[in-house]
């Protein structure tokens, strides 16, 4: 995982990795963050050309710490069900409930 910028919000490679690792741990233990539904299936309706094959899971990424519940914000990391990092996406700048890619996605 590399650093990325979602809209104008930069994330370090470490922040991206932390979110992807949390998503993987929750997914593998069939658990979620707090009382939320994250991680959950990401259907890729937008048609992103990820470097790894799906199926995919989405999980919120934070600038401080790792998401553990509450408001997810606009930004997500995407992993596949083998816990391979696929990319980072954001609702910011997208219409409706869709996503656009962050830098490097």
UniProtKB/Swiss-Prot annotation:
Keywords: Disulfide bond, Endonuclease, Hydrolase, Lyase, Nuclease, Pyrrolidone carboxylic acid. The modification Pyrrolidone carboxylic acid is found at residue 1. Disulfide bonds join 6-102, 24-83. It is an enzyme of class 4 (lyase). The keyword Lyase applies. Its EC number is 4.6.1.24. The active site is at residues 40, 58, 91. It catalyses: [RNA] containing guanosine + H2O = an [RNA fragment]-3'-guanosine-3'-phosphate + a 5'-hydroxy-ribonucleotide-3'-[RNA fragment]. It comes from the Eukaryota. SUPFAM superfamilies: Microbial ribonucleases. The keyword Lipid biosynthesis does not apply. One of its GO terms (molecular function) is ribonuclease T1 activity. Belongs to the ribonuclease N1/T1 family. This is Extracellular guanyl-specific ribonuclease Fl2.
């Amino acid at each position: 995982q590399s650093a990325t910028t979602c809209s104008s919000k930069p994330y370090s490679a470490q922040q991206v990795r932390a979110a992807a690792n949390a998503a993987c741990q929750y997914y593998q233990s069939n658990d979620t963050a707090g009382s939320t539904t994250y991680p959950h299936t990401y259907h890729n309706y937008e048609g992103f050309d990820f470097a790894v094959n799906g199926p995919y899971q989405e999980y919120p990424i934070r600038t401080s710490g790792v998401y553990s519940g509450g408001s997810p914000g606009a930004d997500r990391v995407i992993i596949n069900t083998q816990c391979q990092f696929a990319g980072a996406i954001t609702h910011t700048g997208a219409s409706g409930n869709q996503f656009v890619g962050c830098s490097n996605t």
